[in-house]
Amino acid sequence: NPLESIVFITLPEDFQISKAAMHIDTTIPLPVQLPLGTDKDAKFDIKTLSEEMILAGILTVLAYDKGNSNLNYYRSIISKAKPNIKKELTEAAILKARNEDFDIAEEIFDALRGLDPEDMGTVLNTALFFDQRADSYRKSGLLEDADAYDNDAEFYYKQAMESEPVIPDAFFNAGFFYLKQKNFSKGKECFEIYLAYVIDIK
């Protein structure tokens, strides 16, 4: 469980460096990613705290602790500290997926959806990722895993196709997905909707 490497700390009022740079509210516990091999039960030394540990902690919480009551605050911290974070993470996730480093790619997509749950571009990218992962596992003969990832892909394709405003590419990619599933009627329906939107846009 990735959350096991996280500790929540409350910064002292006189903590200035990161507080000034990252707009820290010292009344709200801050998630911190502990370095590998650190004893979680040992008292945390505030002098070892870095911006990277805070950002990594926040991303982990965004990815795996969807019920945390401070998510909006954590999102605001990371967005102010790293204005281009979504672009950077998206590029990293796509690169990891392309290199078939699937577990890391999935973690990054989880963090991206936690960072901005309303971003349907991220939802569509997640669908494409699971689609690719299913194809890779199927080619390797891991059919049960492939079927599970197909289910994940369909879940996110459906979300992307319900997006407002409409994302035509969601229907285009879902069409190919359903063709691979041999669900030809659903694939045809997706392509027809895609064409209707594209022609209308032109």
Residue ranges of model-derived segments:
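TPR alpha-solenoid repeat register
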Residues: G121-T122, A170
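TPR-adjacent "capping" and linker segments in tetratricopeptide-repeat scaffold/adaptor proteins
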Residues: K43-K47, N72-T90, K202
